[in-house]
Amino acid sequence: MTGPAAAPVPDAPASLDVSGLAFAYPDGHQALFGVDFCVARGERVALLGPNGAGKTTLVLHLNGILTGGTGTVTVAGLPVDKRNMAEIRRRVGIVFQDPDDQLFMPTVREDVAFGPAAAGVKGAELEACVDRALTLVGMAEFKDRPPHHLSFGQRRRVAVATVLAMEPEILVLDEPSSNLDPASRRELADILRSLDVTVLMVTHDLPYALELCPRALILSDGAIAADGPTAALLSDDDLMRAHRLELPFGFDPRSVRASG
């Protein structure tokens, strides 16, 4: 799973296809209103939007944590439904904002091994799987360390490794740059660029989205309000204002060479 980021493969099934997805919570709050989008294999796509737009609700549908709405979600051609749930949860790896939500074992190695071991991987194959995932995120030398002895940035990289160990079709990242110092932020960006995996990145960090994702979706009031090149969307002042998105003071997306 190393090497340059894969180019989209036009003849392969889309990594992610969301069609007509609508969802209301039991209290009657309608969070999603007919969401439609498709992510090709190998794409890196940012999911942007203000608080309350429905981003978390959408993400929780991608691997079946939330169900019961209308519309469909498919991952590499496989519908997200009860029959396919085990395989869907292998194919869709979600890295949560707080790595401590994913790291709960005594050592880094045990955390990364947990998913594959639960899926029946054993022995030398399991060790190779752990080593491969930790190498991808530059954390192989820390595999015998307790996670709570690591820095926040290192724990986030280990959290990514726990997902990569399952060899997912798509990596979903929730606010990956939050609480990272500049060096850790840069290191994580380099890692994400190197992965041969489809990426959907949920973030309020618009410069990071521009740096890593050639394409962006804006989710606003439970619907896709815009879908296009990240640089173009961030340069559209009217669009940004309409959906309560703000760039850092002095940051001009037109002056930045976006990630390819």
UniProtKB/Swiss-Prot annotation:
GO molecular function, a single term: ATPase-coupled transmembrane transporter activity
Membrane topology of the entry: Peripheral membrane protein
Alphabetical UniProt keywords: ATP-binding, Cell membrane, Membrane, Nucleotide-binding, Translocase, Transport
EC number: 7.-.-.-
Enzyme class: translocase
Source organism superkingdom: Bacteria
Transmembrane regions: none
Matching Pfam families: ABC_tran
SUPFAM superfamilies: P-loop containing nucleoside triphosphate hydrolases
Subcellular localization(s) per the UniProt record: Cell membrane
Positions of ATP binding: 49-56
Gene Ontology cellular-component annotations: ATP-binding cassette (ABC) transporter complex
Domain ABC transporter residue range list: 16-246
Location, primary (coarse class): membrane
UniProt function note: Probably part of an ABC transporter complex. Responsible for energy coupling to the transport system.
Record family assignment: Belongs to the ABC transporter superfamily.
Name the record gives this protein: Putative ABC transporter ATP-binding protein SCO3161
Organism: Streptomyces coelicolor (strain ATCC BAA-471 / A3(2) / M145)
